[in-house]
């Protein structure tokens, strides 16, 4: 919150008491974990109105669509004179979403005060820079990623609907570079060992350690928020909410 004191504004982070924001859980042993109903009021962070807002404003967010094979679609982009990067066509984005394709919104970490405050709690607890990534589908029978790994540790927050997950014992070594064509166990008939088999429901939170293989099995209309925690902390992100006097 903001407190007016003379000519200055003193800022105090809204400290969240959440079971997964506990360094003691991670200091000796790094394994996938789940906390049931651990995130109160999850739709304060993202809901279908905010999803529509982001896809109506692709100039300000990284918006993507997954194809039926679980790979990111390379949609045509246009370069407008006032913007420094290519922007996908909104009509194509909404057509894909309304057909039931899985969508992704990245660079969502400053969307609103609730998101900023949640990520500030992460960054004040752990040695990391965070973003928020939104995943979802508006129709049943959508597809998502196959078995894959990510560089940073990740917290998956189920916002709406349900998602079944497998998290595996296998990890990719830090010796291996992340590329646009990573090793895909599913395509190589590589059977992985399940460490965690779980279905997340609204308010549930799951932790996936760095470089650990994992795979979602989505069903039904759903929304989730991923919080990747890139370590170590590099440049602090200003998550304060300022006012104009």
Q: Where are the regions that the model predicts?
A:
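Active-site region of the double-stranded beta-helix
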Residues: 5-18, 23-26, 41-45, 52-53, ...
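Residue-level recognition of conserved beta-strand edge/terminus positions
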Residues: 207-209
């Amino acid at each position: 919150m903001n407190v007016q004191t003379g000519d200055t504004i003193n800022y105090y982070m809204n400290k969240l008491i959440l079971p997964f924001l506990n360094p003691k859980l991670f200091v000796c042993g790094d394994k996938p974990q789940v906390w049931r109903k651990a995130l109160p009021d999850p739709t304060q962070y993202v809901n279908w109105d905010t999803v529509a807002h982001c896809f109506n404003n692709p100039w300000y967010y990284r918006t993507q669509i997954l194809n039926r094979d679980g790979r990111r679609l390379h949609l045509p982009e246009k370069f407008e004179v006032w913007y420094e990067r290519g922007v996908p066509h909104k009509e194509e984005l909404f057509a894909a979403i309304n057909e039931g394709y899985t969508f992704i919104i990245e660079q969502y970490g400053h969307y609103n005060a609730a998101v900023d405050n949640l990520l500030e709690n992460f960054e004040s607890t752990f040695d990391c820079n965070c973003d928020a990534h939104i995943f979802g589908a508006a129709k049943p029978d959508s597809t998502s990623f196959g078995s894959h790994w990510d560089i940073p540790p990740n917290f998956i927050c189920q916002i709406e609907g349900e998602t079944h997950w497998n998290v595996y014992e296998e990890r990719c070594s830090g010796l291996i570079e992340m590329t646009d064509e990573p090793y895909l166990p599913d395509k190589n008939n590589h059977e992985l060992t399940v460490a965690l088999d779980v279905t997340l429901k609204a308010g549930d939170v799951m932790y996936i350690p760095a470089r650990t293989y994992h795979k979602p099995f989505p069903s039904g209309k759903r929304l989730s928020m991923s919080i990747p925690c890139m370590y170590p902390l590099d440049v602090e992100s200003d998550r304060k909410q300022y006012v104009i006097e």
